[in-house]
Amino acid sequence: MKPPVRVAITGAAGHVSYSLIFRIAAGHMLGKDQPVILQLLEIPQAMDVLKGVVLELEDCAFPLLHGLVCSDDVHVAFKDADYAILVGARPRGPGMERSDLIQANGPIFTTQGEALSAEANPEVKVLVVGNPANTNALILLKNAPYINPRNITAMMRLDHNRALFQVAKKMGCHCSDVEKMVVWGNHSASQFPDISYAEIAGEKVAKGVENNWHGDNLIPIIQQRGAAVIKARGASSAASAASAAIDHMRNWVLGSGGKWVSMGVYSRGNSYGLDEDIMFSLPVICEDGDWREVAGLELSSFQRAMLEATEAELQAEREAVADII
């Protein structure tokens, strides 16, 4: 059996992590032959709840779980981490604007970036889940000088998975049959779910749907899906977010099998003329523990306008935290 790897998880007593941690311990993320040591971080006032999660983890007797670390100290939780999934973030409170939320999360991700850079494996792979994920990831990146910017990512896989299902539902097929789906930009209502390249069995999806379905149906459904979940269940997406995090990390580590996936990545060197200092969701292919951009796709004027709109939002978010990056 392989030697165990260390997986750090922040916000470990929260709803998303409750759906995430047990799946990682069961081998769903890194494979059935990869033992893990879970390093769980929480704020002091949630440590008692985290103890309950640990009791349940112990009671599962997972063969792949080779150790547990629980702490409210980032330096302890991130020590020698090979993977870090940053779920914890300041939630949006009543009357808070998005800009307020971004600024409130700034100190959290500044501290975590510094600690990861100091304590983690230098090749640590980082996924930021806590919202606003793209700009939180940018803050982290700017405060983690010893981590390769390519190894810091923001989660767009939930949006990607949502789009796969909606396209499959429309086309009467299984979501695993849909290929070359792309979600561009920010994890927000400005994101751009794009079917321009999507295929099912080699046939273009765009040819099989009404001309207005993409703009009038798919795009708003995906952009507002998170709000629809909150309205229906009275809480934000948890199990689906955890599943998306598993998918993101599994493909990044083990490969995406040649398939396109959407990942929020540092935009430096991108082939689409985008601002080179934001965390922007691009189509990528994962192989050999790395990702590469699907470069040079042809863009229509509509696509370009959609990319520019979400790019502008990310630029505004960056400006809101300019003093800490």
Swiss-Prot record:
Q: Which reaction does it catalyse?
A: (S)-malate + NAD(+) = oxaloacetate + NADH + H(+)
> What Pfam families does its record include?
Ldh_1_C, Ldh_1_N
Report residues binding NAD(+).
G11, A12, A13, G14, H15, V16, S17, N105, Q112, V129, G130, N131
> Cross-referenced InterPro entries, in alphabetical order?
L-lactate/malate_DH (IPR001557), Lactate/malate_DH_C (IPR022383), Lactate/malate_DH_N (IPR001236), Lactate_DH/Glyco_Ohase_4_C (IPR015955), Malate_DH_type2 (IPR010945), NAD(P)-bd_dom_sf (IPR036291)
Top-rank taxon:
Bacteria
Q: Does the keyword Oxidoreductase apply?
A: yes
Select a single GO molecular function from the record's annotations and give it: L-malate dehydrogenase (NAD+) activity
Q: What is its EC number?
A: 1.1.1.37
**What Gene3D superfamilies does its record include?**
Lactate dehydrogenase/glycoside hydrolase, family 4, C-terminal, NAD(P)-binding Rossmann-like Domain
Q: List the disulfide bonds.
A: none
Q: Which GO terms describe its biological process?
A: malate metabolic process; tricarboxylic acid cycle
Q: What residues sit in the active site?
A: H187 (proton acceptor)
Transmembrane stretches in the record are: none
Which of the seven top EC classes does this enzyme belong to?
oxidoreductase
List residues binding substrate. R92, R98, N131, R162
Keywords in alphabetical order, please. Answer: NAD, Oxidoreductase, Tricarboxylic acid cycle
Q: Does the keyword Transcription regulation apply?
A: no
- Biological role stated in the UniProt entry: Catalyzes the reversible oxidation of malate to oxaloacetate.
Family of the protein in this entry: Belongs to the LDH/MDH superfamily. MDH type 2 family.
Protein's name according to its UniProt entry: Malate dehydrogenase
Q: Please report the organism this UniProt entry assigns to the protein.
A: Desulfotalea psychrophila (strain LSv54 / DSM 12343)
